[in-house]
Swiss-Prot record:
The chain crosses the membrane at residues 209-229. Changing residue 203 to P: Disrupts transmembrane anchoring. Glycosylated. Contains high mannose- and complex-type oligosaccharides. Glycosylation at Asn-180 is mandatory for high affinity binding to the Fc and for discrimination between fucosylated and afucosylated IgG glycoforms. This is Low affinity immunoglobulin gamma Fc region receptor III-A. Keywords: Cell membrane, Disulfide bond, Glycoprotein, IgG-binding protein, Immunity, Immunoglobulin domain, Membrane, Phosphoprotein, Receptor, Repeat, Secreted, Signal, Transmembrane, Transmembrane helix. One of its GO terms (biological process) is positive regulation of natural killer cell proliferation. It comes from Homo sapiens. InterPro entries: Ig-like_dom, Ig-like_dom_sf, Ig-like_fold, Ig_Fc_receptor, Ig_sub.
């Protein structure tokens, strides 16, 4: 019965008035999280969306052109500049996702961050990424031309709670052997106002979609079980009432 209820509940949900605009939006995630990468880096894009039991394929788009891959993850083994651009995905029970930008750069070093605009008290994670992950030492992170953090061996730079003073231009530099190399400069902006904690802090957008869908399915299954049990109880009660009992006296009662 359980195998029948789950697919049936989902199909009823889709067929009973769910229009395209009512479907949840798919979400694209980058893994690792950096949207700026160097040539030869490997990148995985993951599509989080809702699927029906009959169709678990995914449509991928690169700069609005359909990609042949139909898996939920799209893997780029060795990125080239041609891989730069916007990526979107869609499933049969999710609408087209918002675009996710991928930038493939040429160079020895690249300063990476999940984003460049933060709110006060947000954590900031910076990474001085080297081409092909070549060993890098005597690494310095600089803000507005002044050294901010030094590492003898390459390490990520963390700012636990951003303040307005953390706004500015950043780059990193280090040594490849005896060769001194630097990344391009990027601007980090800190805006006023504390970050507000919401349910999205605990559930990424894609998981919110799955969570809501699961709750609807559980409600449908629970309703189905209720009516099934109620019908069985009525049937048992009716059979008990219709049954005729015959009584007889025990010989000892004479």
């Amino acid at each position: 019965m359980w195998q029948l209820l789950l697919p049936t509940a989902l199909l009823l949900l889709v067929s009973a008035g769910m229009r395209t605009e009512d479907l949840p939006k798919a979400v694209v995630f980058l893994e690792p999280q950096w949207y700026r990468v160097l040539e030869k880096d490997s990148v995985t894009l993951k599509c989080q969306g809702a699927y029906s039991p009959e169709d678990n394929s995914t449509q991928w788009f690169h700069n609005e052109s359909l990609i042949s891959s139909q898996a939920s993850s799209y893997f780029i083994d060795a990125a080239t500049v041609d891989d730069s651009g916007e990526y979107r995905c869609q499933t049969n029970l999710s609408t087209l996702s918002d675009p996710v930008q991928l930038e493939v750069h040429i160079g020895w070093l690249l300063l990476q961050a999940p984003r460049w605009v933060f709110k006060e008290e947000d954590p900031i994670h910076l990474r001085c990424h080297s081409w092909k992950n070549t060993a890098l030492h005597k690494v310095t992170y600089l803000q507005n031309g002044k050294g901010r953090k030094y590492f003898h061996h390459n390490s990520d730079f963390y700012i636990p709670k951003a303040t307005l003073k953390d706004s500015g231009s950043y780059f990193c530099r280090g040594l490849f052997g005896s060769k001194n190399v630097s990344s391009e400069t990027v601007n980090i902006t800190i805006t006023q106002g504390l970050a507000v904690s919401t349910i999205s802090s605990f559930f990424p957008p894609g998981y919110q979609v799955s969570f809501c869908l699961v709750m609807v399915l559980l409600f449908a299954v629970d309703t189905g079980l209720y009516f099934s049990v109620k019908t069985n109880i009525r049937s048992s009660t009716r059979d008990w009432k219709d049954h005729k009992f015959k009584w007889r006296k025990d010989p000892q009662d004479k």
